[in-house]
From Swiss-Prot:
PANTHER family: 50S RIBOSOMAL PROTEIN L33, CHLOROPLASTIC (PTHR43168), LARGE RIBOSOMAL SUBUNIT PROTEIN BL33A (PTHR43168:SF6). Belongs to the bacterial ribosomal protein bL33 family. This is Large ribosomal subunit protein bL33. The gene is rpmG. The lineage of its organism: Bacteria, Pseudomonadati, Campylobacterota, Epsilonproteobacteria, Campylobacterales. It comes from Campylobacter jejuni subsp. jejuni serotype O:2 (strain ATCC 700819 / NCTC 11168). PROSITE patterns: RIBOSOMAL_L33 (PS00582). It comes from the Bacteria. The keyword Ribosomal protein applies. The keyword Ribosomal protein applies. Keywords: Ribonucleoprotein, Ribosomal protein.
Length: 52
C-alpha cells in the first residue's frame, strides 16, 4: 500500500517535497539529501506524515 509522505528540511523546518512510499517494503523513515530553496543549499530531509 502506498502512502503519501512529506520531506521536511532538518535545518529550516519547511516541508519542501511530497512523495509516495510503499509502507510494506520501506518500514523505516526516509532520509534524503535534497535541495532546500529557502537556504539555497542541499540539506538532510526526513519523512513526516502529511494531512490528507
Amino acid at each position: 500500500m502506498r502512502i503519501k509522505v512529506g520531506l521536511k528540511c532538518e535545518e529550516c523546518g519547511d516541508i519542501n517535497y511530497s512523495t509516495y512510499k510503499n509502507s510494506k517494503n520501506t518500514t523505516e523513515k526516509l532520509e534524503l539529501k535534497k535541495y532546500c530553496p529557502r537556504l539555497k543549499k542541499h540539506t538532510l530531509h526526513k519523512e513526516v506524515k502529511l494531512k490528507s
